[in-house]
């Protein structure tokens, strides 16, 4: 019999963010330094360990898994891991990716019916994109986004908005959304790891973005689930119609409705993106899960912890 995980604040844990690895083929300015060193493959959870942990967690109400990184498509055993997870009792299996390797894996994703992608795409300007990511992959990423969209993937673009870098592109992102019928979500820069040094200079709030959008677009609120990380709108401007969302982790934190747990690439289960500790469940027998999980979720805060020094690629966004 399944056991639902409900914490002392009445939040039921339903979603797992699974950080496959900390390695990435970008060096986004808010995520990690350019000289970042990564964990060895031998130190990461094996595909069998991942399948066992996720299978066990489904017995405690976990219904959705999102693969994150680093860049999950870089994992040398990505296909083996994905195949294993498709056999777990999940309502949804999704991926957050930078799309550099998406074209290589797109047929495999289709074969395994994984059609939900959150794609990090911080700028529609190639020079700004290169500056943010420290790569020259703009055209590759853009073409992969459009190809996946044409193939029927459910795509959400994640754009971290930053003053004096990409904030002026807000209208362009809405036009892009309208043209391609792709949801664009504007993310606030978070006080996490590498981004701490940029926060004061580049932070832009969701309200500032909405104010800018409202100069040219009419906004209609879209109802969202209580545990949604974003609040969403349909934006219209003449014949243009854009689907947009806001993840306002700093100015409008959603901790009170959070239903997520986070599993590190080494097997550490964390109750919150801002907490860098938790039990390692890589070898935990199923008989001990109830006690371990219930102790963990009652350490899950219902308020926003101000900041953490752990890097985003080590947590998984």
Task: Locate the predicted segments by residue.
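A short acidic, helix-capping loop that chelates divalent metal ions and anchors anionic groups
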Residues: 36-40, 125-132, 193-197, 280
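Accessory C-terminal segments flanking Radical SAM cores
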Residues: 193-307
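Glycine-centered loop/turn positions within well-structured domains
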Residues: 26, 126-127, 253, 279
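Canonical Radical SAM [4Fe-4S] cluster-binding loop centered on the CxxxCxxC motif
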Residues: 8-48, 272-273
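Residue-level signature of catalytic and energy-coupling elements of molecular machines
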Residues: 20, 184, 267
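N-terminal [4Fe-4S]-dependent radical SAM core
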Residues: 1-17, 27-29, 59, 230-232, ...
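Extracellular/luminal ectodomains of secreted and membrane glycoproteins with large N-terminal domains
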Residues: 189-191
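Radical SAM/AdoMet-radical enzyme domain recognition
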Residues: 47-67, 71-187
């Amino acid at each position: 019999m399944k056991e639902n995980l409900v914490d002392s604040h009445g939040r039921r844990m339903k979603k797992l963010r699974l950080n496959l690895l900390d390695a990435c083929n970008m060096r986004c300015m808010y995520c990690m330094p350019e000289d970042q060193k990564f964990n060895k493959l031998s130190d990461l959870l094996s595909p069998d360990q991942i399948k066992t942990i996720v299978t066990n967690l489904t017995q405690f109400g976990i219904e959705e898994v999102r693969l994150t990184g680093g860049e999950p498509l870089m994992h040398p055993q990505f296909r083996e891991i994905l195949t294993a997870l498709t056999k777990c009792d999940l309502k949804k299996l999704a991926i957050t990716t930078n799309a550099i390797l998406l074209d290589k894996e797109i047929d495999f994703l289709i074969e395994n019916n994984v059609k939900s992608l959150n794609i990090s795409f911080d700028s529609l300007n190639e020079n700004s994109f290169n500056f943010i990511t420290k790569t020259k992959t703009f055209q590759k990423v853009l073409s992969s986004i459009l190809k996946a969209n044409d193939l029927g993937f459910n795509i959400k673009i994640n754009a971290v908005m930053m003053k004096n870098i990409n904030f002026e592109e807000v209208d362009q992102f809405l036009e892009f959304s309208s043209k391609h019928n792709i949801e664009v979500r504007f993310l606030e820069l978070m006080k996490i790891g590498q981004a701490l040094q940029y926060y004061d200079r580049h932070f832009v709030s969701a309200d500032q973005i909405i104010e800018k959008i409202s100069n040219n677009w009419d906004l209609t609120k879209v109802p969202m689930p209580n545990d949604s990380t974003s609040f969403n709108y349909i934006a219209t401007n003449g014949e243009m119609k854009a689907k947009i969302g806001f993840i306002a982790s700093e100015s409008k934190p959603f901790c009170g409705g959070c239903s997520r747990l986070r599993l590190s690439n080494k097997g550490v289960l964390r109750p919150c993106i801002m907490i860098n500790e938790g039990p390692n469940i890589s070898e935990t027998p199923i008989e001990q899960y109830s006690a371990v999980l219930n102790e963990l979720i009652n350490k899950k805060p219902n308020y926003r912890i101000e900041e953490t020094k752990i890097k985003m690629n080590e947590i998984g966004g």
